[in-house]
C-alpha cells in the first residue's frame, strides 16, 4: 500500500460518502417493508435484523410505524468519513477494542493491543507491538520490530498538510505514556523513557528521558537487556 500524503488524506475525507450505519432489531408485521436498496435484511416471520444506512432505515420505520411493534437501533458513528480497516486478511495479531481506520498499513506479525487508536495514513512495520491505549495520529510511521508502550501518543499530522509526520525507525522502544510531537524522528535502535515528551529528533542507539526529552546515554548492554524485543509474542 502506498502511504498517503496529507493532501491525499484530505481529499479522501472530503470526497468520501459520509456514513451513519446502523443495526436494527425489529419486530412486527414485516412482510413487504422496503428498507432501502443498500440494506441487508435477515427477517424470519415477524422478527429480524436489518443492517443499513440510518437515513434509509429511519424513513422505512416512519413510513411503516403502524406495522412495527418494537425496534432497537444500534449505532456507533454519525456521518463518518473513514470506514474501519478490514482486518480479516491481515497477517498480524489484533486484539479486541483496537480502533484502526481505513488506509492504515500493518506489517506481518505486528501486534496491536486493546484500546489502541490508529488513524488514517499510519504505517506499522513488521513485528512491531502497539501496546494498550496507544494513539497513532494520522500518517505516523513506525518501523520494524519496535515496541510502543501503553498509553503513548505519536502525534498525527493531517493539517497543516505541509507538516512532517512522526517517524519511528526500526528497533525502537518507547516507554509507557511517552509523547512524540509532530515532525520528530526517533532514530534506529533508540529508547525513549516512560513519560518522556519528545520535541526534537532522537539519535540512533541513544536513550532519552524527561520533559522535554534529552539524551542521557548511549545504548549499552544493560539497556539492551531491559528493552529486549521478544519474537515469541509476535508469532501467529
From Swiss-Prot:
Reactions catalysed: (S)-2,3,4,5-tetrahydrodipicolinate + acetyl-CoA + H2O = L-2-acetamido-6-oxoheptanedioate + CoA
MF annotations from Gene Ontology: tetrahydrodipicolinate N-acetyltransferase activity
Pathway: Amino-acid biosynthesis; L-lysine biosynthesis via DAP pathway; LL-2,6-diaminopimelate from (S)-tetrahydrodipicolinate (acetylase route): step 1/3
Name of a matching Pfam family: DapH_N
Keyword entries, A-Z: Acyltransferase, Amino-acid biosynthesis, Diaminopimelate biosynthesis, Lysine biosynthesis, Repeat, Transferase
Keyword Phosphoprotein in annotation: no
The EC number(s) this enzyme carries: 2.3.1.89
Record flagged with keyword Acyltransferase: yes
GO BP terms in the entry: diaminopimelate biosynthetic process; lysine biosynthetic process via diaminopimelate
CDD domains, per the entry: LbH_THP_succinylT
InterPro entries given in the database record: DapH, DapH_N, Hexapep, Hexapep_transf_CS, Trans_hexapeptide_repeat, Trimer_LpxA-like_sf
Disulfide bond positions: none
Family matches, as NCBIfam families: DapD_Ac
UniProt cross-references to PANTHER family, sorted A to Z: 2,3,4,5-TETRAHYDROPYRIDINE-2,6-DICARBOXYLATE N-ACETYLTRANSFERASE (PTHR43300:SF10), ACETYLTRANSFERASE (PTHR43300)
Similarity comment: family membership: Belongs to the transferase hexapeptide repeat family. DapH subfamily.
Name this polypeptide is given: 2,3,4,5-tetrahydropyridine-2,6-dicarboxylate N-acetyltransferase
Species per Swiss-Prot/TrEMBL record: Bacillus pumilus (strain SAFR-032)
Amino acid at each position: 500500500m502506498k502511504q498517503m500524503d496529507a493532501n491525499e488524506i484530505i481529499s479522501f475525507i472530503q470526497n468520501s460518502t459520509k456514513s451513519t450505519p446502523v443495526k436494527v432489531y425489529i419486530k412486527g408485521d414485516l412482510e413487504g417493508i422496503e428498507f432501502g436498496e443498500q440494506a441487508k435484511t435477515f427477517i424470519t416471520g415477524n422478527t429480524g435484523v436489518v443492517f443499513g444506512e440510518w437515513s434509509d432505515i429511519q424513513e422505512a420505520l416512519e413510513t411503516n410505524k403502524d406495522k412495527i411493534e418494537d425496534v432497537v437501533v444500534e449505532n456507533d458513528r454519525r456521518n463518518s468519513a473513514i470506514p474501519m480497516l478490514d482486518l480479516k486478511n491481515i497477517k498480524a495479531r489484533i486484539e479486541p477494542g483496537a480502533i484502526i481506520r481505513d488506509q492504515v498499513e500493518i506489517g506481518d506479525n505486528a501486534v496491536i493491543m486493546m484500546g489502541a487508536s490508529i488513524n488514517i495514513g499510519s504505517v506499522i512495520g513488521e513485528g512491531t507491538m502497539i501496546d494498550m491505549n496507544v494513539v497513532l495520529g494520522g500518517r505516523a510511521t513506525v518501523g520494524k520490530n519496535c515496541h510502543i508502550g501503553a498509553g503513548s501518543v505519536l502525534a498525527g499530522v493531517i493539517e497543516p498538510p505541509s507538516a512532517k509526520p512522526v517517524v519511528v525507525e526500526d528497533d525502537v522502544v518507547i516507554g509507557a505514556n511517552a509523547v512524540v510531537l509532530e515532525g520528530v524522528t526517533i532514530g534506529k535502535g533508540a529508547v525513549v523513557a516512560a513519560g518522556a515528551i519528545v520535541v526534537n529528533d532522537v539519535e540512533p542507539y541513544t536513550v532519552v528521558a524527561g520533559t522535554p526529552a534529552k539524551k542521557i546515554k548511549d545504548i549499552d548492554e544493560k539497556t539492551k537487556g531491559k528493552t529486549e524485543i521478544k519474537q515469541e509474542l509476535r508469532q501467529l
